[in-house]
Amino acid sequence: MPARQSFTDLKNLVLCDIGNTHIHFAQNYQLFSSAKEDLKRLGIQKEIFYISVNEENEKALLNCYPNAKNIAGFFHLETDYIGLGIDRQMACLAVNNGVVVDAGSAITIDLVKEGKHLGGCILPGLAQYIHAYKKSAKILEQPFKTLDSLEILPKNTRDAVNYGMILSVISCIQHLAKNQKIYLCGGDAKYLSAFLPHSVCKERLVFDGMEIALKKAGILECK
Amino acid sequence: MPARQSFTDLKNLVLCDIGNTHIHFAQNYQLFSSAKEDLKRLGIQKEIFYISVNEENEKALLNCYPNAKNIAGFFHLETDYIGLGIDRQMACLAVNNGVVVDAGSAITIDLVKEGKHLGGCILPGLAQYIHAYKKSAKILEQPFKTLDSLEILPKNTRDAVNYGMILSVISCIQHLAKNQKIYLCGGDAKYLSAFLPHSVCKERLVFDGMEIALKKAGILECK
């Protein structure tokens, strides 16, 4: 590996997680997101270290910030899973024992035991369920309704659709988690977390993993 | 109510359940289905009693068999649910205590206690999940794969998608059922039943409900 610049503090660099819809950044402890069209406007001066699951958005980042560095090769997550997304790998790297849920445009559920990734499964993103309901029957294309609780059984179509979607996602996570701690990240983390007693929202989970990876690679100094 | 012909035996009439995709029939103890284009070819001679959730398919039936009778008005299911599909009502009418799952182009899950419908929820049909996955990310549009068990955690994208879909449906049903008996009908009933220990497949469930309704209305003689 070539000699690389080393940073004494997270403050001196910018972390970037390139997703399928948005591009997420962590600058020190500030989090912000951008569409690929707005990247230039961000005017980032510091060195960018990134991961990406979307080639097109990655190109857009490199177009604006040609020195940004992909850190996918700088770390290793122990797993037998073939094709595990780099964002899922980073989130799992930040958890030693527990269940990692990334609830974004898809919902990924991964199990980690003593730092080893044991496997995981994928559900559609909450906003994407509408397409499956619409194809099931026209009347099932219902507007999203936030639920306060799953205690009361639905008594109309709109509630029945929203309840089914949330209960199936929640009970799937709980079935896999059993009594383990649940770590949630992604846009729907906060909403889902309210239904999961043993869970914590960790907005920075992917960035926490990136920080660990940079430390292991010696790019960021361990304090 | 006008005087109606009374039948001594189920053998003397044909039951019909008009769905969104197919039109299902029960002739004595034989079950068969038809697309609306093929109805004429069936050449049914006996009197038809039907329920319908699809206006277009209903018109097609009446076009071929103008004497067919809609029995929706002939019965009552105790419920506070507004807009409960007539097929769900009929399936629930056939169960006194338990959970009724109709796994077709949508998956409906309904709870019945001492003959009263307590409420229920709706999930997309298994075949319809593909549309939600596709919208979540292109790579998640995976072909359906039948799973033998949910014991082994997925270690690739195709398994992760199929496992997530099945586990979320199964764990949702189990969460609602607790220790109650689960009655499954619809095209995917047999497949789902294999993952649900306290379940029975009842292919005729909707027709059993229709038979009860006809008996209560005095159209079919009680033996």
From Swiss-Prot, chains A, B:
ATP binds at D17, I18, G19, N20, T21, H22, I23, H24, S105. It is an enzyme of class 2 (transferase). K(+) binds at D102. Keywords: ATP-binding, Coenzyme A biosynthesis, Cytoplasm, Kinase, Metal-binding, Nucleotide-binding, Potassium, Transferase. A monovalent cation. Ammonium or potassium. One of its GO terms (molecular function) is ATP binding. GO terms for cellular component: cytoplasm. Substrate binds at Y81, G85, I86, D87, R88, T157. CDD domains: ASKHA_NBD_PanK-III (cd24015). GO terms for biological process: coenzyme A biosynthetic process. Its cofactor is NH4(+); K(+). Pathway: Cofactor biosynthesis; coenzyme A biosynthesis; CoA from (R)-pantothenate: step 1/5. It is found in: Cytoplasm. The keyword Transferase applies. The active site is at D87. Homodimer. Belongs to the type III pantothenate kinase family. Catalyzes the phosphorylation of pantothenate (Pan), the first step in CoA biosynthesis. This is Type III pantothenate kinase. It comes from Helicobacter pylori (strain HPAG1).
